[in-house]
Amino acid sequence: MSINNYLTNLQNELYVNGTEREKIRKSIDTISSRMNMYFGIGKNCEHRIVKKEIFGSYSRDTMLSRRYDEKSDVDYMIVFENANQYNPQTCLNWLKGFAEYWYSTSIVKQSLPTIVIELENIKFELVPAYETLWGTKYIALDTSSWQYTNPKELNDKMLDVNNNTSYVFKRMVRIIKYWNIKKNYRKYISYELETFLTDKFQYSYSNCKSSLDYLDWAFYFLGQYKYIDQYVHQG
């Protein structure tokens, strides 16, 4: 088997598809409908949800199959009305109440700044948020403060690069993420790794003709990581 054939097979293995993707989709739909019910009755009506949004690697289509990354999760942003009038911990408590009510047989825990629900097929991280009148979003930074976020920015940039590289880029990103897990001991934060590679490949891919070329170029860029401290996981 040639190296390029091996890489093609690995890319297919890492991708979340088929039954696994369908189970995740059903879990998302179930959580969404249960939230509508939970926050639509009794005292919980006070905490009205105005928007729910999947973000993170699942929305970018760069999440690895759980067969290759046991820590794969789906990030779910929950935008509450007037959440800016509360500290993030209060909103996290609302989400924890929901999770414990509907998922009493699953592992539910707070892992700042999210509430984690560990289902059999996938882990969800519920992230409280609020949105301004101008559409600017803020998510929990810690228990007492909010931080600006714009998931669409990276999603759009990554989509452009992927289209410009004939859909090779995202497949390459998944391989690099797998390498970071298995050989690099998760040294690099997944989100920052994807951001770094997207920025680098925006204008530097014209000489890449095969999957191996893209990987070779990616590892060349990764050699610069030691000079870019914000991309290195300190924990």
Question: Which functions belong to the PLM regions below?
Answer:
Residues M1-K71, N84-N87:
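N-terminal regions immediately upstream of nucleotidyltransferase
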Residues K71-V79, P151-K157:
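Glycine-rich, often proline-containing surface loops adjacent to acidic residues and nearby aromatics
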Residues S57, E81-A83, A129-E131:
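Beta-hairpin (beta-strand-turn-beta-strand) motif
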Residues D29, Q110-Q234:
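Catalytic cores of NTP-dependent nucleotidyl/adenyl transfer enzymes across multiple folds
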Residues R25-I28, S32, L92, K96, ...:
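Extracytoplasmic/secreted envelope proteins and their assembly/folding machinery
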Residues S65, V74-G97:
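A broadly used, surface-exposed interaction patch
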